[in-house]
Amino acid sequence: MNIVILAAGTGKRMRSALPKVLHPLAGRPLLSHVIDTARALAPSRLVVVIGHGAEQVRAAVAAPDVQFAVQEQQLGTGHAVRQALPLLDPSQPTLVLYGDVPLTRTATLKRLADAATDARYGVLTVTLDDPTGYGRIVRDQAGCVTRIVEQKDASPDELRIDEINTGIVVAPTAQLSMWLGALGNDNAQGEYYLTDVVEQAIEAGFEIVTTQPDDEWETLGVNSKAQLAELERIHQRNLADALLAAGVTLADPARIDVRGTLACGRDVSIDVNCVFEGDVTLADGVTIGANCVIRHAAIAAGARVDAFSHLDGATVGANAVVGPYARLRPGAVLAADAHVGNFVEVKNATLGQGSKANHLTYLGDADIGARVNVGAGTITCNYDGANKFRTVIEDDVFVGSDTQFVAPVRVGRGVTVAAGTTVWKDVAADMLVLNDKTQTAKSGYVRPVKKKS
């Protein structure tokens, strides 16, 4: 089967410089969702028709299995499909999809394709309580489809029809080529409608078959930011329902956003207002607190991420604890039982098994061993204004509060670093390191008094 995806429209009602089909749904372009659905049907040819913002669209979805046809002028859906004909296999039927209709199920399209075998012309229709704005499916007294009429060209009787055309069709390609060549544009829009092909198919003796999706939202398109927001909520609720069915506990299914792939083990619990982006894995027994953002991360069994934490490109070991208000940046690796607490930032650094940095700390470009205690206010000074250097802290080190490690520097196993120390030289194992300070206490000191105005 050939699949053609129409993605050439301007999307004026989006009021955006970004081509409509590139607006994100769940963090990915609308068009990418449609391409994924098309791929699931294993087409022999996959062609995307581009026009407005053609090069931008091409760059966003380019792949070895995707071919592109260009519609220089947006002269209607029939004209758009015609641009793809040279790239299609005429011996295979063609399924036409739309780059701004992202939620159609693969099973729905397969059902339509199966119904349109043996040189039938298949149309996906849906019955709406309010069909305003859509083309109507006109049938005769026997229930056979006779034509599809667009809203602007419909008579008062036809406007009362509640079965509408979704625009998604399956047609025999060789005949479709002839029918498209014979299309006229004698209509209110002056465009070449793909829907007008139906009458030609009937005249040629082809049976018009219709199927409907299981859910009305499968055929909803995006023409405005409001419609985009509506589809985002539908899609996110579908994803939440799938997580619930898989045994994930969601504090509120309406307050989770998945903008990528979220794989969960058993007994995973997710609190409200969490966002998951890219590829995220939550192993058995993971708990995610409220208002967390987790991107491209792997979190091992039994780990806990407390509220308001932000993880990006991080790996969290079994039974580790993160947060609240922690930030793990790309390259952060926490071993089993490690703790990273409030207002701690870890970047391109490893924290060994059982090590803890519980308060107000920056650990960047560092290798920290097991059972290390990092006191509040500790900073690895990794940048000299031109280059970054690593800090190495071996196992069983105790780091007092308000400590700075000026990289490159290595601190040996079992070292104790006194509070307020700046470490700029390597320290051998089991040493106490501190900066000499004197403390002076003076009697008779009087605090200043605020002057009266």
From Swiss-Prot:
Active site as annotated: H359 (proton acceptor)
Record bears the keyword Magnesium: yes
Keyword Membrane: no
UniProt-annotated stretches for the region Linker: 226-246
Stored Pfam families: Hexapep, NTP_transf_3
Segments traversing the membrane: none
Co-factor: note: Binds 1 Mg(2+) ion per subunit.
Job of this protein: Catalyzes the last two sequential reactions in the de novo biosynthetic pathway for UDP-N-acetylglucosamine (UDP-GlcNAc). The C-terminal domain catalyzes the transfer of acetyl group from acetyl coenzyme A to glucosamine-1-phosphate (GlcN-1-P) to produce N-acetylglucosamine-1-phosphate (GlcNAc-1-P), which is converted into UDP-GlcNAc by the transfer of uridine 5-monophosphate (from uridine 5-triphosphate), a reaction catalyzed by the N-terminal domain.
The protein's name: Bifunctional protein GlmU
Species of origin: Burkholderia mallei (strain ATCC 23344)
Species lineage: Bacteria, Pseudomonadati, Pseudomonadota, Betaproteobacteria, Burkholderiales
The encoding gene: glmU
